[in-house]
Curated annotation (Swiss-Prot):
GO terms for cellular component: cytoplasm. Residues 247-267, 611-639 are annotated as: Disordered. Residues 627-639 have a biased composition (Gly residues). The keyword Protein biosynthesis applies. It comes from Streptomyces lividans. Residues 1-247 form the tr-type G domain. This is Tetracycline resistance protein TetM. Belongs to the TRAFAC class translation factor GTPase superfamily. Classic translation factor GTPase family. TetM/TetO subfamily. SMART domains: EFG_IV. Pfam families: EFG_C, EFG_IV, GTP_EFTU.
């Protein structure tokens, strides 16, 4: 049986969960339609999700059509849960991008489409809610071509749009489809220019090929609630998006080592962690011993090994084969992002979170349970980067205020803990400015000091590398426990740099070492390492960087001058201005700490008509005269 892993992506309230419920019901996977409003949907499994009517964690459900099993992954629509979307993108064979026929193309939709196009992930556009008052079809197609992708063609037509009588009919690939395909398919272009004109079969083959390579996007219409157009959408999924098979997933079931990625973690009924694994090659069966690679927040790669004690393959198979998804349990627990058989080739499409907050228990007796709960939540979302901070608090990284509210509710409902969050602050980072070193010799006569010899060199590492530790001394020159003490302390110490911000993209090398067998302990090395490291770091110097966000603002033509003046005053660097009457699109990059102000002031300048979207991009050195950590703008100092 073939397997098709499909992600459903959209702006909040475009109908993702409703479409999932419709697909499951129409193909016999559930015996009744769930409702987001009623709180009885299949894929929305948390109390917070049910009350808010939004998806927070990617959920998996499956149905079967003929010889194809379709695994549906219902992803979050809110921008504060962008990390969940990124993990889902890694495991997909294709995607359905939903639009509301009433609200049309929204800011979040454009961000998602950019990510899908960068990945060249096969994507079908589905215009939902055609039976709602105010629904548009022809005008919306123009917006899709202008704002999402010019390479799109409708394969359905709608009659009586905007009324309960709305209905959908198929529109076979024709000359208009061929003209749209000609922009991305040279054979179709040659046939249109030189003849003979392509037949319907020729156009259909080209449509399938260009959809499969992610360069073209078929568009369907329908209503998830009413069911109109859903059969046509399924027909498009099966016919236009290549399904995973053992051959296309990177291995067969006959002896190749398994390769896959953990994209979600959920707590089990007995407190165990259940991991969701997409397998790209090989096979996994119960009791098999697996070794996962884990990238720690400080840049190190560690191994997690264990036997599979529980394996539930989506669809009910006994063995997990290439292309499929399963929930499994391994003693010791897995984290989101753990890789089986090495990393995948796909790079992250979204930057890490840039807001930092401190979390404390409202009641002192809950301080220890709060730390344990936050560590458990960090296993589900490693980008939280939970770590100890000053005064018994825990520091977290977040994307926005909604994520903070959800975390507070999760702690209260799932763990019984009342937590208090400080207002989110932009997280600054330090990077080494140069290379330098420091050393401290073992004091043979002074027993009040550390019985250890340590020399360290600090230098810049490649951008995006995090942190690395190496040796120029012989590994046998120190006991293993002393080596481990130095390495762990280096990474712990650099969580706070010279200005109070965390240090990143560094390489620290142990260049000198020594110990006294009867006197030295690992504690001596843990105590001396921070002193030597901070001396070397101060000599090398650091450069403070602040996060930036790439923005896109669509504004009425008569407000362009006022908008650009505002953005310039907030420190924006412009990368482009396109369009004309009636609207202009302004793009650029803006310090993350000024984004909220831009969002609040734009509506007043544009009669409420501005469409704004932004996403984290590469950070930059902090400009002279701007405030950094510890000043009320940057991260928390002294952590």
């Amino acid at each position: 049986m073939r397997t098709l892993n499909i992600g459903i992506l959209a702006h909040v309230d475009a109908g993702k969960t409703s479409l999932t419920e419709r697909l499951l019901f129409d193909h016999g996977a559930v015996d009744r339609l769930g409702s987001v409003d009623a709180g009885d949907t299949r894929t929305v499994d948390g109390g917070i999700e049910r009350r808010r009517g939004i998806t927070i964690r990617s959920a998996v459900a499956a149905f079967t059509v003929g010889d194809t099993r379709v695994n549906l992954i219902d992803t979050p629509g809110h921008s504060d849960f962008v990390a969940e979307v990124e993990r889902a993108l890694e495991v997909l064979d294709g995607a359905v991008l939903l639009l509301s026929a009433v609200e049309g193309v929204q800011a979040r939709t454009r961000v998602l489409m950019r990510a899908l196009r960068r990945l060249r992930l096969p994507t079908i556009v589905f215009v939902n809610k055609i039976d709602r008052a105010g629904a548009r079809t022809d005008g919306l197609l123009g917006d899709v071509r202008r704002l999402l992708t010019p390479h799109v063609a409708p394969l359905t037509e709608v009659a009586d749009a905007g009324t309960p009588r709305a209905r959908v009919t198929r529109r076979p690939p024709d000359g208009r489809t061929a003209e749209a395909l000609a922009e991305v398919d040279t054979e179709v272009l040659a046939a249109l220019v030189d003849g003979p004109e392509p037949t319907g079969e020729d156009v259909a083959r080209a449509l399938a090929a260009r959809t499969a390579d992610g360069s073209f996007h078929p568009l369907y219409h329908g209503s998830a609630l009413g069911g109109q157009g859903v059969a046509e959408l399924v027909e498009g999924l099966l016919g236009l998006i290549p399904a995973a098979t053992p051959g296309t997933s990177g291995g067969t079931s006959g002896g190749t080592e398994p390769r896959g990625t953990v994209f979600a973690v959920r707590p089990g009924p007995a407190g165990e962690r259940t991991a969701y694994l997409r397998l790209y090659g090989g096979e996994v069966h119960p009791r098999r011993r697996l070794t996962f690679l884990r990238r720690e927040s400080d840049g190190r790669t560690t191994e997690v090994s264990g036997r599979v004690t529980r394996l539930d393959v989506v669809g009910g198979d006994a063995t997990l084969t290439a292309g499929n998804i399963a929930a499994l349990t391994v003693p010791g627990g897995l984290r989101v992002g753990d890789r089986l058989g090495g990393p995948t080739d796909r790079a992250p499409q979204f930057a890490p979170p840039t807001l930092q907050t401190l979390v404390r228990a409202r009641h002192p007796e809950q301080a220890a349970p709060l730390r344990s709960a936050l560590l458990a939540l960090a296993d589900q979302d490693p980008l939280l980067h939970a770590r100890p901070a000053a005064s018994g608090a825990t520091a977290l990284l977040l994307y926005g205020e909604v994520q903070m509210e959800v975390l507070a509710a999760t702690l209260a409902e799932d763990f019984g803990i009342e937590a208090e969050f400080t207002p989110g602050r932009v997280r600054f980072l330090e990077r080494p400015a140069g290379t330098d070193e420091a050393a401290e010799e073992m004091p043979w006569l002074d027993r009040t000091r550390y019985f250890a010899t340590i020399g360290l060199r600090v230098e810049p590492g490649p951008r995006g590398s995090g942190g690395a530790f190496g040796y120029e001394t012989e590994l046998g020159a120190l006991p293993r426990a002393f080596h481990q003490a130095v390495e762990e302390t280096v990474h712990d110490t650099l969580r706070t740099g010279l200005t109070g911000a965390a240090v990143t993209d560094y390489r620290v090398t142990l260049i000198r070492s020594g110990f006294s067998s009867p006197l030295s302990t690992a504690a001596d090395f843990r105590g001396l390492t921070p002193l030597v490291l901070r001396r070397a770091l101060a000599r090398a110097g650091t450069v403070l960087h602040e996060p930036y966000q790439a923005f896109e603002a669509e504004v009425p033509a008569d407000t362009l001058a006022a908008v650009t003046a505002l953005l310039a005053s907030l420190g924006a660097d412009f990368t482009g201005t396109t369009g004309g009457d009636p609207a202009w699109i302004v793009t650029g990059e803006l310090p993350a700490r000024r984004v909220r102000e831009a969002e609040l002031r734009l509506p007043g300048l544009t009669h409420g008509e501005a469409v704004w979207s932004s996403r984290p991009c590469e950070d930059r050195p902090l400009k002279a005269g701007n405030s950094g950590p510890g000043t009320g703008v940057g991260g928390h100092s002294g952590e």
